[in-house]
Amino acid sequence: VTSQLFHAIPAQLNSNASRYQVSSVIEDSRVERLQEQIAILKDSMTTNIAYHANDPSAGLAQHISTEQFKLFCADTGLFVTLAFWDEGFTSNTIYQKLLSDKLRADIGYVYENIVAQILTASGRKLYYHTWPTEKGNRNYEVDFILSREGKICPIEVKSSQSKEHVSIDA
């Protein structure tokens, strides 16, 4: 079960869901029943967990939802290997195309994983925030939220030339 949760990290991030959806990885499962496996992943230091901050204000840790989280790989090279697992082995061609921005795939989730790895390596806890749009048919999301000197600092990760940041403007 722990292995299934780990191997699904790239697919879960690529799905653009507002959280890691355990039930789509392990049928009929809920986060509450898999707390031990999630703790194993966290303690193994192969994953980084970003918790949903229900109230994006100073003291983020006081306002988290332990049932709403995103999992990231602690090592982006390992993340890329998992994302392209169907290759038999992740060829150097994939890495070369990735590094030269010529990989024909939506790889925004790879950049999110890179930012998660950098923030964690710098000693930061990971938090993100979502809230419904005015119409309520989808959610806005701020990819990462930091608390610095009593102020909230949103981080929006972009993988393209797009300069729009709808979530931050909302």
Where do the language-model regions lie?
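Accessory nucleic acid-recognition modules appended to NTPase machines
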Residues: 1-151
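Short conserved micro-motifs at the rims of enzyme active sites and ligand-binding pockets
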Residues: 83-86, 156-157, 166-167
